[in-house]
Amino acid sequence: MPFTLGQRWISDTESELGLGTVVAVDARTVTLLFPSTGENRLYARSDSPVTRVMFNPGDTITSHDGWQMQVEEVKEENGLLTYIGTRLDTEESGVALREVFLDSKLVFSKPQDRLFAGQIDRMDRFALRYRARKYSSEQFRMPYSGLRGQRTSLIPHQLNIAHDVGRRHAPRVLLADEVGLGKTIEAGMILHQQLLSGAAERVLIIVPETLQHQWLVEMLRRFNLRFALFDDERYAEAQHDAYNPFDTEQLVICSLDFARRSKQRLEHLCEAEWDLLVVDEAHHLVWSEDAPSREYQAIEQLAEHMPGVLLLTATPEQLGMESHFARLRLLDPNRFHDFAQFVEEQKNYRPVADAVAMLLAGNKLSNDELNMLGEMIGEQDIEPLLQAANSDSEDAQSARQELVSMLMDRHGTSRVLFRNTRNGVKGFPKRELHTIKLPLPTQYQTAIKVSGIMGARKSAEDRARDMLYPERIYQEFEGDNATWWNFDPRVEWLMGYLTSHRSQKVLVICAKAATALQLEQVLREREGIRAAVFHEGMSIIERDRAAAWFAEEDTGAQVLLCSEIGSEGRNFQFASHMVMFDLPFNPDLLEQRIGRLDRIGQAHDIQIHVPYLEKTAQSVLVRWYHEGLDAFEHTCPTGRTIYDSVYNDLINYLASPDQTEGFDDLIKNCREQHEALKAQLEQGRDRLLEIHSNGGEKAQALAESIEEQDDDTNLIAFAMNLLDIIGINQDDRGDNMIVLTPSDHMLVPDFPGLSEDGITITFDREVALAREDAQFITWEHPLIRNGLDLILSGDTGSSTISLLKNKALPVGTLLVELIYVVEAQAPKQLQLNRFLPPTPVRMLLDKNGNNLAAQVEFETFNRQLNAVNRHTGSKLVNAVQQDVHAILQLGEAQIEKSARALIDAARNEADEKLSAELSRLEALRAVNPNIRDDELTAIESNRQQVMESLDQAGWRLDALRLIVVTHQ
């Protein structure tokens, strides 16, 4: 290898050193200085891992002074090169630049530059890069992007709402599904879609204080969204880092109380430029025209500053018309400004609901009914659709569905309000109550008497809370070492029940973490019962492990002991037996407890066991819940209303359980009130709204389509290949689970989403739902998205050389495989990837420019090739550099036609879809005032920007592979 002082070379093994200069040569060695790092390297002359850097006419080079030049001619004299060309800054022509004055920080980013500089990748990395481009492009084009990656069951009504709302510009909607139907999941799906598509980047979630951790856990476990929890302490800390503390995080959860307590804090929240606000339990925001509550005003102020708002609330009729109007007013104050007008409007929806019911019934329609439908929809060209709907043809059903869809678009609050009820959604289990009355131990009787004397000044509410948990009263007097479990009959009963039902998974819930911990110890020590514990003092990872142990069928825990707060946000559908060791203070908490098992998808009827002590607040409460509200065996939408109305009386009975006079009358009154309210709710159901929210057959088809995509085996093969190349260890644990751990030779030292201890993953949705410690891997999971980003944002796999053993071709025949990418640059929120994601175009050219890609499929061809080591590859490249340049020019001439076809198709699709959406909403605007002006303006602006961006779309060479034919 001829070396001359002043020549520029690059290291094949340490390309990060930049451009080296030959500074010393003797008979056996050569020394290179790398000025950008100041390091020297000594190599053997005969076989050194370095490549000569030589540029060609057409290349752009940079001098060590920073100016750039377009090369027009290359001269060689005594082994040194001089480049002649035109300076780009001054446009001076005929400028000469000797190679010794080239910029030493030279980075080869173009695939051809890397190839000619000897920066040759392994063959498997080239294949991975092409697959990453191909799959990435396909995923952007897939329908339902953003709906496939969450760890949830594929429940049609949830998918329907999320699909509708998640694609809107700055959605402002009210989610009012009945309890147990998954409002939190619907909100999470909408957020996931908006964040994934770039429609939103900053999200604020405001919830009651008791639900903060539930939301934090749900967003992380189900959607891989890492929210930051802001409380007083976190807010104070963040003030050191930014003028506005909320600018330090993109995704934030805080409590309503935290938001409204300080005027400055509320101002900071309003100024933080969020894209989306989510408010849970919005029915607690009290409003009247004369006196809106402080909480309501705080949310109103925030909603004015934010483009998108999701309000989650109990069913509207449960709360009265005024309360319902107040919620809608937060979403669109211009549309919902007059309560009296709103009440009048609601009455007018009855004929529309009747018309929908008539269409869905499938009976023949009279002329009067057809005329009425025509008037309601108000379209000129609807006659053929009406005739089809009334015919016996195969199209009748789809025509009726289309008419229903048109009616719902044009009437009611269906664009701003979604509400599903249990009556309209199938798949819920029955609930059966088993009460076990137990004697009150003398130890507790004594403790309660003493407590009554000493706590005479306590309020009735405090006494009532004490009386619910007699073991805590006993411990107050006997100290922490008091062994209440030795005489409490509930413990005896629990042990007996568990030992006689060893094969059943049982969820035991108690109010306090200390009780759960003490029960675990007793069950383990006395009966050897395997029990996992779950309480608020544990980290999310510890809770995941406990839940996973409980979920294991054969070797797992038989029992999961949960505290009230610890179990928030967790569901255990695989269990159907629940023991309430004590009772919660209000009906909402009771429903929350039962809701751990009573979910859609629960395969068995739920058995609720309540062991209670007679003559205690527990005996009062169990009767009131069951006989007064029927709250154990059915969901109780009336519970909170009745609880509030009888609160004082109920508290007095709980505080003094021995005073039973009048209690039967209270229960009777509550039951009557419950039945009346329930009938009122049923009568007030908005069938039109339920049909729209449920989604019907369309929602079912959506769920089935996503289920089909779940079976995509390409993902598993690609993910394993990707993890291999990144350098992540994989250990197959069986049961469709794999443990990933970092290795010492990763492409990056710290891979996002992979902790030091490693993670467990699964590609199976059912396994992910049963095993909380296993992450559900889809194309939308951060692990895959970060991996794709790592490969595609750098130059991994962008240049390689392979040998093709094929005796049908002459030795030394050259082929060049080119991977071009056609793409358009635009802000993420334009969601340009719907129409033109970065799309790979593969070409396989011979030296005459014949493109063989259509005849030679990538994977088949890839299997026929053999790798070349880097050093041999560099020599091969140097030998055929001129030929490769010529083939590259032929490729540049051919790519334009393919790229233009892709860009034109994307323009046509974008224009058609966005114009159709705009026309539809403009037509509806005439009959449905729930379509906001800003939504129409945004769609038109979005359309213009998308078309402009597509006009400027281009293409570039992303990767190339040089193939040399050999016979050996």
From Swiss-Prot:
Gene3D superfamilies membership: 2.30.30.140, 2.30.30.930, 3.30.360.80, 6.10.140.1500, 6.10.140.2230, P-loop containing nucleotide triphosphate hydrolases, Tandem AAA-ATPase domain
Pfam family, one: Tudor_1_RapA
Gene Ontology molecular-function annotations: ATP binding; DNA binding; helicase activity; hydrolase activity, acting on acid anhydrides
PROSITE patterns: HELICASE_ATP_BIND_1, HELICASE_CTER
Record's keyword terms, sorted: Activator, ATP-binding, DNA-binding, Helicase, Hydrolase, Nucleotide-binding, Transcription, Transcription regulation
Keyword Repeat: no
Domain Helicase ATP-binding: 164-334
Keyword Nucleotide-binding carried by entry: yes
Record-annotated Helicase C-terminal domain positions: 490-662
Highest taxon above the source species: Bacteria
Binding site for ATP: D177, E178, V179, G180, L181, G182, K183, T184
EC number: 3.6.4.-
Residue window of motif DEAH box: 280-283
Summary of subunit composition and partner proteins: Interacts with the RNAP. Has a higher affinity for the core RNAP than for the holoenzyme. Its ATPase activity is stimulated by binding to RNAP.
Entry's family note: Belongs to the SNF2/RAD54 helicase family. RapA subfamily.
Cited function: Transcription regulator that activates transcription by stimulating RNA polymerase (RNAP) recycling in case of stress conditions such as supercoiled DNA or high salt concentrations. Probably acts by releasing the RNAP, when it is trapped or immobilized on tightly supercoiled DNA. Does not activate transcription on linear DNA. Probably not involved in DNA repair.
Name of this protein: RNA polymerase-associated protein RapA
Species this protein is from: Shigella boydii serotype 4 (strain Sb227)
Gene for this chain: rapA
